């Protein structure tokens, strides 16, 4: 199966193929979303999720969108993610970031490179209205082939939309380590991700969080 993006000009009756890429179809662990037993859901999505399950992820790296857009040094944020990735030394982390992860236009999202995310096991893009408009998310297209090969999960979350959740209270109340840039927060703890391809639902769960420093 393949996903095809195209444009059509009705006046000229012309068709233009923009891109074509294989659909995600590999076999993966998929348990659906179980009874969470009162555990805290910090992120929730209702579309375009990659089916799969992650348990006992020790780290969540979060980009504060207010800090990111209040500083013009976007590429320092991206390189800071690379530094954290290097320090992980084989430990996996969940990456949560506003806009289009990997965009060449830093106004649309963090211009991180895929080799700076080699220890990332899950990417969450946040659709947060900014100055009256909602940046279009990438839905994982910037790194699609790499995500498929490395079994990296993906989900988009849209602030303010029904069946979507960004628990800002959790991100504010829990302690974090500041990364190489003030926009980068590192949360230590135990996280799980459940993404059900059949219902197109995805959640990130806090199983118990702490921070050093």
Locations of regions flagged by a protein language model:
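Conserved divalent-metal-coordinating catalytic cores
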Residues: 1-213
């Amino acid at each position: 199966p393949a996903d095809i993006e195209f444009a059509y000009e009705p006046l000229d009756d012309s068709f233009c193929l923009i891109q074509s890429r294989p659909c995600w179809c590999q076999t993966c662990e998929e348990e659906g979303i179980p009874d969470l037993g009162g555990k805290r859901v910090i992120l929730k999505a209702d579309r375009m999720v990659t089916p799969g399950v992650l348990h006992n992820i020790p780290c969540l790296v979060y980009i504060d969108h207010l800090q990111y857009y209040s500083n013009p040094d976007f590429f320092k944020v991206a390189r800071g993610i690379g530094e954290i990735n290097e320090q992980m030394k084989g430990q996996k982390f969940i990456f949560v970031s506003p806009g289009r992860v990997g965009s060449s236009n830093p106004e649309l999202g963090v211009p991180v490179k895929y080799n700076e995310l080699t220890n990332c096991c899950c990417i969450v893009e946040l659709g947060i209205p900014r100055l009256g408009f909602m940046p279009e998310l990438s839905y994982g297209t910037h790194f699609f082939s790499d995500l498929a090969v490395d079994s990296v999960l993906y989900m988009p979350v849209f602030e303010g939309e029904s069946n979507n959740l960004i628990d800002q209270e959790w991100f504010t109340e829990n302690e974090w380590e500041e990364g190489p840039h003030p926009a980068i927060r590192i949360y230590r703890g135990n996280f799980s991700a459940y993404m059900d391809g059949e219902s197109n639902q995805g959640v990130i769960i806090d199983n118990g969080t702490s921070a050093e420093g």
